[in-house]
Every structure is written in C-alpha cells, then in structure tokens.
C-alpha cells in the first residue's frame, strides 16, 4: 500500500502521521497541495501517486476541490468529498445534526438582510452570527443590539460574495 498525505502547510501533525506510517512499513509520501494541477483528461492527471490519500489541507476549499479531483481519478481519499462538503458548511452540518437529533444550539438561517433583521427583532439578543464556511472564529459576530445588526447588514451588503447573503444565526 502506498499512502500519500496531501497538505498545504506542513505541520507537526502531518510530520507525525508520515513518521508513524513509515515506522509501520507503509510507503508514504508527503505532497504539497499548492503546485498540484489536474485535468479533465484523465491521461494528463495521473502523475499523482498513491493507493490512498489522506487530505490534510488547512484551506477548506483547496482540500475540498483537490479531493473532488482525486475522486474523479478514482483515487480513495480520506475524507471523501461529501464528508468535507458537509463538515465545511455550518448550515449543512446543522441540518444533519438536527435531523439526527444531536443536541446543538438553536440555529436559524435567513437569505436576505431584511429577513435577518426581522429574525433578530423576533428572537431578541444576544445572538451570534457565523459565516457558513470558516474556522478559528473568523467572521463570528456577537450580536448584542440593533446597532450591531445594522452594521452587519451594511457590511454584508457591500460584500460581493453570494455566501454573505445567507445569515447563519445561533442563540
């Protein structure tokens, strides 16, 4: 078996995974994700080697789409594209947790600034607004009053990202 560990920043964890696999006699490669390229022409994209790929990219979208390309080429990837897509999207994750009756904060989704404002008026404060995609607390806003709601609405309306029109709010 040949294991390829794909990363975009070589951290302690990737080095340890590599070392432990080598110590167990597994042929292992560390592959930097940044210079990788793929093609829809399968014959052009087989330069990447491995029987199984452990996708360890910090960048959600880089890892997600590298996984998609590897699966297109019929490679086995841990974790699969569908798993990465769900886990990287708070709305999708929240829906699955709720459907599976796994306790989590009360969560609401709106799809316009106006409905976001109506929701905050109905629920009251404090609330928390989170981006659909992201980690490490980036883009998380505590909402304690209507002034904060108005500032967030203005910021989001100036942003060209389609995801900024979706408001993910938790009590």
Model regions and ranges:
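Short gly/ser/thr-rich secondary-structure transition/capping motifs
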Residues: 33-40, 107-111, 163-166
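A conserved helix-loop-beta module that forms one wall/lid of the active-site cleft
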Residues: 26-31, 70-139
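Phosphate-binding site of ATP-dependent enzymes
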Residues: 142-171
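Short secondary-structure boundary segments
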Residues: 57, 131, 171
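Short acidic active-site motifs
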Residues: 38-41, 115-118, 148
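Short catalytic-loop micro-motif centered on adjacent basic/acidic residues
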Residues: 4-5, 53-55, 79, 105-107, ...
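Short amphipathic alpha-helical segments and helix-helix/interface helices
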Residues: 14-18, 67-68, 94, 116-117, ...
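ATP-binding N-terminal substructure of ATP-dependent carboxylate-amine bond-forming enzymes
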Residues: 1-83
